[in-house]
Amino acid sequence: MNVEEILKTEQLNKSYENGLKVLNDITFSLKKGEVVVIIGPSGCGKSTFLRCLNMLEPVDSGTIRFKDRVIDRANKDVYELRQKIGMVFQSYDLFPHLTILDNILLAPVKVQKRERSEVAKEAEDLLKRVGLSDKTNVYPRQLSGGQKQRVAIVRALMMHPEILLLDEITAALDPEMVREVLQVVLELAREGMTMVIVTHEMEFARAVADRVLFMDQGVVVEEGSPEEFFNSPQTERAKQFLNMFHYEAR
Amino acid sequence: MKKGLLSALLGITMAAGLLAGCSQAKAPAGAPAQEASPSAKARSLDEIKKAGTIRIGVFSDKNPFGYVDSNGKIQGYDVYFGKRIAKDLFGSEDKVEFVYVEAASRVEYLKSAKVDVILANFTVTNERKEQVDFALPYMKVALGVVSPDKALISDVSQLKDKTLIVVKGTTAETYFSQNHPEIKLLKFDEYQEAYDALADGRGDAFSTDNTEVLAWAIQNKGFTVGIESIGNLDTIAPAVQKGNTELLEWLNGEIKSLAGEQFFHQDYKETLEPVYGDEIDPENLVVEGGQV
Amino acid sequence: MQNLGIQILFQGNNFLRLWVGLWVSLKLAVISMFFSICLGMLFGMVMTSTNKLVRFFCRLYLETVRIMPQLVLLFLVYFGAAKHLNVNLSGGTAAVLVFTFWGTAEMGDLVRSALESIPVHQYQSGYALGFGKIGVYRHIIIPQTIRRLLPSMMNLLTRMVKTTSLVVLIGVIEVVKVGKQIIDASRYTVPDAALWVYGVIFIMYFAVCYPFSRAAALLDKKLRD
């Protein structure tokens, strides 16, 4: 078993200006093809951690390594590295002034300088796969929340990232739209996409994850396979957290 | 007070203004370098002669002194004189550039050397003499009194215990309240209100600058200016920048020499008579040779 | 014989003169607006700076422009520059300078508020796609800002067209002044000319400004869809 390690953090620390410690000595590694789900209560630092992986936020100390390269936020290659680490956010972050197709093509054409006709074909294939091939020429505001998030995923995939970061991508959706988005993520996982996912959907986490990380107060409290974690959590904090999703009949 | 504010803000404004649009800020070539002074140096008589045209500031909406006719041509009593100045300086009355000025900025035009002479119905006052140099007068104004033909007022004594209409803030108000307390004054803010009051019979007569009432009476049948000249006589004269002596002296000489041909009577006939008619005496308005 | 006020418009080339006057107003407003938009974009970006000193000076500039009547600025630049700096600007140049100075401040403030109204996620999505700062502004933020700015930009332009009537005080003959000249030239013969002349000027302003605001509305609608 020789699995390539693709992303690695060592002792990441980060505090807010008010002194609140949001990341506390996080050491983490991700293998190629692996799907890691991070769960935990609100404010536990999981979203911040994800954004630090993509260098959208600076860390106070510690290193982030992508393959063999140490990532430095001040360095110019940060723009190049971000293309390899795609990200989808919680809020619908499509660009409102562009059509769906232009949203998807903007970065491949402007950043990666690829031929528009070539990427357009790829975009149409991907849109077809997520069931949105008839939406190429409409504007984001004409789409439902679930449709927008599927487009956002396609937009991230178009950059051919080696890792995809998903930050609570269904948290702002109406319940009936959650499934259509998560279905797309499940398929990506099946195809071997390397992903780090922050979510509150426990059933989905159990289905998609190779490994689960439970974070609380900036610390990774518990780590394990989904079966181990969901069936027999080891720590008291994890048990309490999981119980919040559990309702007893009277 | 206002001037202090202006100077204080000048620095900031210019710096920022130039910054905001430095691409267009072109300093005209040939502006002579000189130390900062409150006014830009006006062109001397020699410089004007060398340049071949004179710049004269006139009104463009004060009929009949300076106004633009329906073909876009500048006309009027002041303009007529301005053309003559060009003719006597350069041999052609076209060698004059008329700059259209506003009453409020006449002094500034001279101080900033944007015009050589102001010929814009500029009344000589002591206050203005501190800012600019006036040449000899070429016109005079006094107060006039207009009244209905049916009860014409032709002497100020007839106004005793009667109602005289005036406009607030005019010389007429000051003159009558100081010198004729026996006359009741009815005051208005606007000229139009005053004329309406006269037409309605709310007063027996109306007084303001004679040039104004004379022109009005021509257009309004049944009213006549019974007193064409009363009160302090004001004179109207060309003005140049303070200290521009050569030009001032040339203008004085010009006005004196024009008396020989009664130039301003001719000017009156061409420009004012069509408005005032031939019933009034030009001697009430025209000044020849600077002799009031 | 009753002389109708409307006749005054067709005497000589009065009607043409009014249009020429309006053209002067428009030219001043459009040129000033062009510079105001270019410089205002930059100024607006500077205004969003987190540097306290930079913000203070931006604020100072904006407040100065707002407090100072445009008339004072026009006098300062037209007469003041000649008297104190020996820079003899033409009335038109002085007007463009002043209106640009004013417009840049107003435009900058509009740009600032438009920039600030764009959610932080729009920037982050751009960065996450590999854009640099310039790319994010150029492809994502500025296009959205311009759309948000269109109505207020139109508003500023029409305000500028209207404010051009002040330039007569520095010797620039624009439409309102031409109107006054026409009224005055005939004040003894056609006493009610004012009503007609100002009425026509009103219609001319409308005829010129309405297509502008109409075009902006259409463009705005098109961009929204």
Show where each model-derived region lies.
Chain A
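C-terminal boundary and immediately downstream tail of ABC-type ATPase nucleotide-binding domains
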Residues: E227-R250
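ABC family nucleotide-binding domain
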Residues: V3-P226
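Short, Lys/Arg-enriched, disordered terminal segments
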Residues: M1-E4, R250
